[in-house]
Curated annotation (Swiss-Prot):
Residues 1-24 form the signal peptide. It comes from Ailuropoda melanoleuca (Giant panda). The gene is ENTPD5. The keyword Hydrolase applies. This is Ectonucleoside triphosphate diphosphohydrolase 5. N-glycosylated; high-mannose type.
């Protein structure tokens, strides 16, 4: 099945359509991704490889894709993926950039073991950093990227220009949407029936879908719409990336840590944490002390779902655009949506499952009102589930009954933007045997 959908994915360039993507009044980074000039001509049968690093806020992941061109002159098909990851993410090495680059070097060894030596020199390697590095001061982020470039330069793989960069948030959303809808067969022929995508990272979150109503297009803020053509059809996507609204960034906002200048010696407390808890947490290279509300403290000292939800609600309420159309739409959700659902047995960790938005609220109530029982694995479980509930309902405006397909993989291929980015990479380089 993966091969079949992989073939469908690569049919994207078969039509060789001009696909300039633009915001309402300007061209943007996506211009030329699927241009006809990228269609390979007279290629011979071969096996192709592509290496894509996803440098997220909580970890660095490597995706090694194998593509096979079985018949000369035909576009290659996706045959398989190797996936590995390391923690923490590059942003945790904000003051030790060389050490951060060493984590990338460690994953490159996986690529060496996976890609035949004879293919190393023509296998491209690229790293795209996401919200974790976007949140860092520019000079700090560039120091990390420089060290990664040095690692790549010494590697035996093909290193394209701009091989190490920070990716625009909307780039994540669009490529994830394309990946999911191609792997599920939603974009075949002239069908406009697609699924939306929700990605919840550590530092940012993305929402992308194809609006079905003119009212949505008319009421959408400037910069949230992106148009492109494929299969002789025009798709105008609603897509936006919210920096600072990822799961772990939201923890800091909920705790009030983002509003505190001096954090040394300060313990941040929350109704979302058990009373007995006193701990520390490192995010983005910064150490935070945190704990539960204490009885008798200033304030209510309450714990449980209701006071917790009031805290996370302040993080999202009135800060995200709410397109009415999403209330009746279906979405694929992945990353931390998937992880927290799996952590609480709402879905199977390997196969995923289907949930309604209200299922997250029900589980959040269960966890938060029984904090002593549910915090052995993660003391933030109550806060995370409550935040996800608030993000979906009060942030994006989803209805309780909205259906979410929780998926880590589609047809055995990881969801997310990495496959789409690798596809673009191979085509833009015109790589063939």
């Amino acid at each position: 099945m993966a091969t079949t959908w992989g073939a469908a994915f690569f049919m994207l360039v078969a039509s060789c359509v001009c696909s300039t993507v633009f915001h309402r009044d300007q061209q943007t980074w996506f211009e030329g991704v699927f241009l006809s000039s990228m269609c390979p001509i007279n290629v011979s049968a071969s096996t192709l490889y592509g290496i894509m690093f996803d440098a997220g806020s909580t970890g660095t992941r490597i995706h090694i894709y194998t593509f096979v061109q079985k018949i000369p002159g035909q576009l290659p098909i996706l045959e398989g993926e190797i996936f590995e990851s390391v923690k923490p993410g590059l942003s945790a090495f904000v003051d030790q950039p060389k050490q951060g680059a060493e984590t990338v070097e460690e994953l490159l060894e996986v690529a060496k073991d996976s890609v035949p030596r004879s293919h190393w020199k023509r296998t491209p390697v690229v790293l795209k950093a996401t919200a974790g590095l976007r949140l860092l001061p520019e000079q700090k982020a560039e120091a990390l990227l420089f060290e990664v470039r040095e690692i790549f330069r010494k590697s035996p793989f093909l290193v394209p220009d701009d091989s190490v960069s920070i990716m625009d948030g909307s780039y994540e959303g669009i490529l994830a949407w394309v990946t999911v809808n191609f792997l599920t067969g939603q974009l075949h022929g002239h069908s406009q029936k697609t699924v939306g995508t929700l990605d919840l990272g550590g530092a940012s979150t993305q929402i992308t879908f194809l609006p079905q109503f003119e009212k949505t297009l008319e009421q959408t803020p400037r910069g949230y719409l992106t148009s492109f053509e494929m299969f002789n059809s025009t798709y105008k996507l609603y897509t936006h990336s919210y920096l600072g609204f990822g799961l772990k960034a939201a923890r800091l906002a909920t705790l009030g840590a983002l509003e505190t200048e001096g954090i040394d010696g300060h313990t941040f407390r929350s109704a979302c944490l058990p009373r007995w808890l006193e701990a520390e947490w490192i995010f983005g290279g910064v150490k935070y002390q945190y704990g539960g509300n204490k009885e008798g403290n200033e304030g209510s000292g309450e714990v449980g779902f209701e006071p917790c939800y009031a805290e996370v609600l302040r993080v999202v309420q009135g800060k995200l655009h709410q397109p009415d159309e999403v209330r009746k739409s279906s979405f694929y959700a992945f990353s931390y949506y998937y992880d927290r659902a799996a952590d609480t047995d709402m879905i199977d960790y390997e196969t995923g499952g289907v949930l309604k938005v209200e299922d997250f609220e029900r589980k959040a109530r269960e966890v938060c009102d029984n904090l002593e029982k549910f915090t052995s694995g993660s003391p933030f479980l109550c806060m995370d589930l409550s935040y996800i509930t608030a993000l979906l309902k009060d942030g994006f405006g989803f209805a309780d009954s909205t259906i979410l397909q929780l998926s880590k993989k589609v047809n055995n291929i990881e969801t997310g933007w990495a496959l789409g980015a690798t596809f673009h990479l191979l085509q833009s380089l015109g790589i063939s045997h």
